[in-house]
Amino acid sequence: MTTQDELKRIAAEKAVEFVPENEYIGIGTGSTINFFIEALGKSGKKIKGAVSTSKKSSELLAQYDIPVVSLNEVSGLAVYIDGADEVNHALQMIKGGGGAHLNEKIVASASEKFVCIADESKYVSRLGKFPLPVEVVESARSLVSRKLLAMGGQPELRIGYTTFYGNQIVDVHGLNIDQPLTMEDEINKITGVLENGIFARDAADVLILGTEEGAKVIYPCQG
């Protein structure tokens, strides 16, 4: 039986085909992305540079001599490659288990195409089993948590974690996310919320799924 890491690697290696040469690209964060950076580095493909969403990704890119640039240095990105904690058939996602979802949304929004890579366990019919991360200003944490509780969730502070921007993460369990786009907007309207981990406005254009049968390329609303 294929291990989860092997499935991630299958998806990551396939994703290299979606990277155009001589362009700037965006790179996400997480274990699947680590496999992608390795595959890209070994592929010999030449890119102008990568905008990274985390220190870990930047360090790994440097190991493979892939130039890391700031988003402020480029006018746009050809493609953004990232993983997901959950992804549905519309290619809407929950992301941010690593706490980098604000940076990830910024870079995704600057990219012409979003390619999501994941192992097949992440492909779900409905979002919400994975806790939804919400980045909050520390002084508003209790206020935001009460609002999230009223929405049907069970908020839990991520102990000992501070985001890149110095904020806190509240992980929300048990939310019924039947309408991801509406839920994303409603949570972001709460005063004190910086961003949440629903990617509906920035849904993926392509999903590459690592399966027992190999890499499967999926487009929105395909089963």
From Swiss-Prot:
<comment type="similarity">
    <text>Belongs to the ribose 5-phosphate isomerase family.</text>
</comment>
<dbReference type="GO" id="GO:0005829">
    <property type="term" value="C:cytosol"/>
</dbReference>
<dbReference type="Pfam" id="PF06026">
    <property type="entry name" value="Rib_5-P_isom_A"/>
</dbReference>
<dbReference type="InterPro" id="IPR037171">
    <property type="entry name" value="NagB/RpiA_transferase-like"/>
</dbReference>
<dbReference type="InterPro" id="IPR020672">
    <property type="entry name" value="Ribose5P_isomerase_typA_subgr"/>
</dbReference>
<feature type="binding site">
    <location>
        <position position="122"/>
    </location>
    <ligand>
        <name>substrate</name>
    </ligand>
</feature>
<comment type="subunit">
    <text>Homodimer.</text>
</comment>
<dbReference type="GO" id="GO:0004751">
    <property type="term" value="F:ribose-5-phosphate isomerase activity"/>
</dbReference>
<dbReference type="GO" id="GO:0006014">
    <property type="term" value="P:D-ribose metabolic process"/>
</dbReference>
<comment type="pathway">
    <text>Carbohydrate degradation; pentose phosphate pathway; D-ribose 5-phosphate from D-ribulose 5-phosphate (non-oxidative stage): step 1/1.</text>
</comment>
<keyword id="KW-0413">Isomerase</keyword>
<feature type="active site" description="Proton acceptor">
    <location>
        <position position="104"/>
    </location>
</feature>
<dbReference type="InterPro" id="IPR004788">
    <property type="entry name" value="Ribose5P_isomerase_type_A"/>
</dbReference>
<dbReference type="GO" id="GO:0009052">
    <property type="term" value="P:pentose-phosphate shunt, non-oxidative branch"/>
</dbReference>
<feature type="binding site">
    <location>
        <begin position="29"/>
        <end position="32"/>
    </location>
    <ligand>
        <name>substrate</name>
    </ligand>
</feature>
<protein>
    <recommendedName>
        <fullName>Ribose-5-phosphate isomerase A</fullName>
        <ecNumber>5.3.1.6</ecNumber>
    </recommendedName>
</protein>
<feature type="binding site">
    <location>
        <begin position="95"/>
        <end position="98"/>
    </location>
    <ligand>
        <name>substrate</name>
    </ligand>
</feature>
<comment type="function">
    <text>Catalyzes the reversible conversion of ribose-5-phosphate to ribulose 5-phosphate.</text>
</comment>
<feature type="binding site">
    <location>
        <begin position="82"/>
        <end position="85"/>
    </location>
    <ligand>
        <name>substrate</name>
    </ligand>
</feature>
